[in-house]
């Protein structure tokens, strides 16, 4: 059994859930991140117990590898089992959002109560696009393996999806992410390339648990994606692609509102 490194947060002592084992919030970070990225939001959602997970190749799971989405979904299921988590809400950002969607659609997700996705890509609709993305991700992976990490990160955060960042914010992210292990990041990047990811929209539309799609109001790429495919979109003010980092208070408020609303819905209802 492969289990991912993780950290548990108990509910606040004054929370009505403190003495009762209710559904957990399980948090999946993005590429180059770690479980620490979710800590401010998880603490603001302190009425619920949280499990913050380090994905393979990241944080304290840096020595772990994964052979694609199905393998990571299995590792997630085994981690939940090892921690005694039977009912849970799954939240993920960017890469973590893609893994969360895959797990909800195709994984062993017994006990899943709902899905929260922040800026996660649904996949690519045809083989030509997938092949082009595989080639692009292989080029990035080669750089992560061979070049000094700060140099690669400088270019990584110049990508269009990070256009809302100012120079100071980019510099802060480069410094924050420079403690990653380049070859481990490269392996995870290749294993979870959009070129390997299935097109998730049809399966998402068949989900029998509530789900929501969160997006910063400056994240034009993913706003357009959510609107194009009529995802259950909620936006966050003054935020780009990494909305939970830019505006953790508003993000936590959206999470809590979704949980409160969804807990009142019949099991087959979708929060749309």
UniProtKB/Swiss-Prot annotation:
It is an enzyme of class 4 (lyase). Keywords: Lyase, Menaquinone biosynthesis. SUPFAM superfamilies: alpha/beta-Hydrolases (SSF53474). Pathway: Quinol/quinone metabolism; 1,4-dihydroxy-2-naphthoate biosynthesis; 1,4-dihydroxy-2-naphthoate from chorismate: step 3/7; Quinol/quinone metabolism; menaquinone biosynthesis. It holds the Pfam family Abhydrolase_6. One of its GO terms (molecular function) is 2-succinyl-6-hydroxy-2,4-cyclohexadiene-1-carboxylate synthase activity. One of its GO terms (biological process) is menaquinone biosynthetic process. It comes from the Bacteria. It catalyses: 5-enolpyruvoyl-6-hydroxy-2-succinyl-cyclohex-3-ene-1-carboxylate = (1R,6R)-6-hydroxy-2-succinyl-cyclohexa-2,4-diene-1-carboxylate + pyruvate. Its EC number is 4.2.99.20. PANTHER family: 2-SUCCINYL-5-ENOLPYRUVYL-6-HYDROXY-3-CYCLOHEXENE-1-CARBOXYLATE SYNTHASE, PROTEIN PHYLLO, CHLOROPLASTIC. Catalyzes a proton abstraction reaction that results in 2,5-elimination of pyruvate from 2-succinyl-5-enolpyruvyl-6-hydroxy-3-cyclohexene-1-carboxylate (SEPHCHC) and the formation of 2-succinyl-6-hydroxy-2,4-cyclohexadiene-1-carboxylate (SHCHC). Monomer. HAMAP family: MenH. Belongs to the AB hydrolase superfamily. MenH family. This is 2-succinyl-6-hydroxy-2,4-cyclohexadiene-1-carboxylate synthase.
């Amino acid at each position: 059994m492969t289990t991912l490194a993780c950290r548990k947060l108990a509910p606040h002592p004054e929370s009505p859930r403190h003495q009762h084992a209710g559904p957990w919030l399980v948090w999946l970070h993005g590429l180059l991140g770690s479980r620490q990225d979710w800590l401010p939001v998880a603490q603001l959602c302190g009425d619920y117990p949280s499990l913050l997970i380090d994905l393979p190749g990241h944080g304290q799971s840096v020595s772990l590898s994964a052979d694609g989405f199905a393998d990571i979904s299995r590792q997630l299921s085994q981690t939940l089992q090892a921690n005694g988590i039977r009912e849970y809400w799954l939240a993920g950002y960017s890469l973590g959002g893609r893994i969360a969607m895959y797990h909800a659609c195709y994984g062993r997700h017994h006990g899943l109560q709902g899905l929260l996705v922040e800026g996660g890509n649904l996949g690519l609709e045809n083989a030509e696009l997938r092949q082009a993305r595989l080639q692009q991700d292989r080029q990035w992976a080669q750089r992560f393996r061979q070049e000094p990490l700060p140099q690669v990160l400088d270019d990584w955060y110049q990508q269009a999806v990070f256009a809302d960042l100012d120079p100071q914010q980019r510099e802060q992210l480069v410094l924050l992410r420079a403690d990653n292990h380049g070859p481990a990041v490269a392996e995870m990047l290749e294993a979870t390339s959009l070129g390997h990811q299935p097109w998730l929209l049809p399966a998402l539309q068949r989900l029998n648990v509530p789900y929501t799609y969160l997006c910063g109001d400056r994240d034009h790429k993913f706003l357009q994606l959510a609107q194009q495919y009529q995802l259950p979109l909620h936006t966050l003010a003054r935020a780009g692609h990494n909305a939970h980092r830019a505006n953790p208070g508003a993000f936590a408020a959206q999470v809590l509102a979704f949980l409160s609303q969804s807990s009142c819905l019949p099991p087959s209802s979708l929060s749309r």
